[in-house]
UniProtKB/Swiss-Prot annotation:
Amino acid composition bias (Acidic residues), ranges on this chain: 461-477
Protein name per UniProt: FACT complex subunit ssrp1-B
DNA-binding residues (ranges): 561-627
Function summary: Component of the FACT complex, a general chromatin factor that acts to reorganize nucleosomes. The FACT complex is involved in multiple processes that require DNA as a template such as mRNA elongation, DNA replication and DNA repair. During transcription elongation the FACT complex acts as a histone chaperone that both destabilizes and restores nucleosomal structure.
Pfam families associated with the record: HMG_box (PF00505), PH1_SSRP1-like (PF21103), POB3_N (PF17292), Rttp106-like_middle (PF08512), SSrecog (PF03531)
Keywords, comma-separated and alphabetical: Chromosome, DNA damage, DNA repair, DNA replication, DNA-binding, Nucleus, Transcription, Transcription regulation
Ranges of Polar residues composition bias in the record: 638-650
Organism of provenance: Caenorhabditis elegans
Amino acid sequence: MTELKFKGVYVEDIGHLTCGTLTLTENSINFIGDKGGKSVYITGTDVDKLKWQKLGNKPGLRVGLSDGGAHRFGGFLDDDLQKIQSFTSSNWSKSINQSNLFINGWNYGQADVKGKNIEFSWENEPIFEIPCTNVSNVIANKNEAILEFHQNEQSKVQLMEMRFHMPVDLENEEDTDKVEEFKKAVLAYAGLEAETEQPICLLTDILCTTPRGRYDIKVYPTSIALHGKTYDYKIPVKTINRLFLVPHKDGRQVYFVLSLNPPIRQGQTHYSYLIFEFGKDEEEDLELSLTDEQLDYFNGNLQREMTGPIYETISILFKSICNLKVTVPGRFLGSSGTPAIQCTHRQNLGLLYPMEKGFLFIQKPVMYIRFEEISSCHFARSDSGTVTRTFDFEIDLKTGSSLTFSAMDKEENNKLFDYLNKKEIKIRNSHRIDNKSAGYGSSDEDDIDPYKSTVKAEGREQDDDSDDESTDEDYDLDKDMKKQKNDKDSSEGSGSEPDDEYDSGSEKDASGTGESDPDEENIEPKKKESKEKKNKREKKEKPVKEKAVKKGKKTKDPNEPKRATTAYIIWFNANRNSMKEDGDTLGDVAKKAGAKWKSMSADDKKEWNDKAAQDKARYEAEMKEYKKNGGGVEKASGPSTKKSSDQSPGKQFKSKEHISDTDDSDDDEPLKAKKDESDAASESSGESD
């Protein structure tokens, strides 16, 4: 048998089990992952040891290599052991040893570095094994060794950190430090340089804003080491995928940003970006420990002695070591004359940089948003008040989520708008802010915030309603008083009785003779003046009464039919629970629903449009029956009041003369008193006759 093939076998790759096909031939072991996954090729001469031990909950094959590495395959059947045993013994002259894992659940044992693997065992029985290549960083802290691991994005459950406590044996004191020796042994096979090697460059007391602190930075050919007062980091050069150099808004500082994948960790916090801050006028001479071969390798971009601003020399150094371009801002300039726009994101103050191929936000959290990830942008009014000098900038991603940058200065609106147009990025409210106007016609504020324009429209409608409902706005008191005086003079000349509608005869001439007292001329101006004051006072109190009427209008009739529901609301209520995930707020669910509704076809929406049409027909039928039974009659009370008042100006004046200054329920009592006084005057006049 020259070939042995197993399907449905998986290989362990940084905590992720990649499924594929394992093929054993006379000269090699070949594993090909399904759907273009990981592939492994091992020659027969590189195989050192073979062990049959479980991987997960199924039997597995551990293939030890001659260089100290190992590959583990799982998903076999118990009967496959005999097949593999006979094949390896006949073709490779290798036997398979059965190795049982110690699974008592103990958390203590012996931690050793065997080959390129960290093996934790108890009395020579293995408990678990971790390849040293999976380790991203080792921190030695007194009697404790902290291991941090690389991450596999395909794995749902990932090993982030592991700590080994190594107590000191007081009876057998040794000069060697167990933790430090363990650290050196792991670093030897983890692809990270040990501290004993000579770095290319040493940068001291460098301010790092993310993660916060001052660090000494050692630059190696394949890694970068950061040493702080509390934390140390080792970053492989291959994990650095982008470099940014951007100025601060004040023009005095410069940010140098490193993008990392996978990110480094500090406790439970991940840092996908490192931000170094340098003074723009700060200069420093750097001496690089480079050989002639290394200088030739970097094509003359680096020199043994480099002078100039520190941010320039460091950016050139990292550009050569990482073999990456340094991304700088393009031609965009904000109102401050710099490429930075000050704003806030989730209550954190920061700077937004429109770059040539994306947006860079510094600093909590640091984000780089590429244009290819953006579906559209939106300008919205800030929520700080009705009259505001700031706006919000929203970025909608193709994944369905959105990012909001708030409190941007209004002067940045047009500059950012023109920038998006040049980059051909879709803008939902595609218009600039050119004119500044006040009042209801403020087009710039209405364009930024559609909700505000709606509120203003409602305000205009309310003003129109108040003009229509006002019965005393066009009333002229002086004309009415002159008319009364003319009517009074004409009635005295003709000897006729005064009109009962005007109470002048009953108030001024109790004898009924039609003649006035000598002091009547002095009393008339006082009464006129008092009426003018009372009229002004009533006009001031009018808005209070109008508000009371308007509040009454807003009260909803409980018998009024329920309004018709739109197709989107019916669909949203039916599918809200299925779209909600753990931790989602109502706003998150609404955004997901809106995006999903827009993507639905007309056929998908047909069911809900039909339901909305049925609900609309139901509402129209119920509303017709409601109005037929007298519903909504109260709305006609305003115009009828105006009509009655327009027909009788005299009665209108009388009502204003006798209206009380208060809004109590005793408003009719002055009218009753006046009527009694008038009746008494008529009786006395009859007795005198």
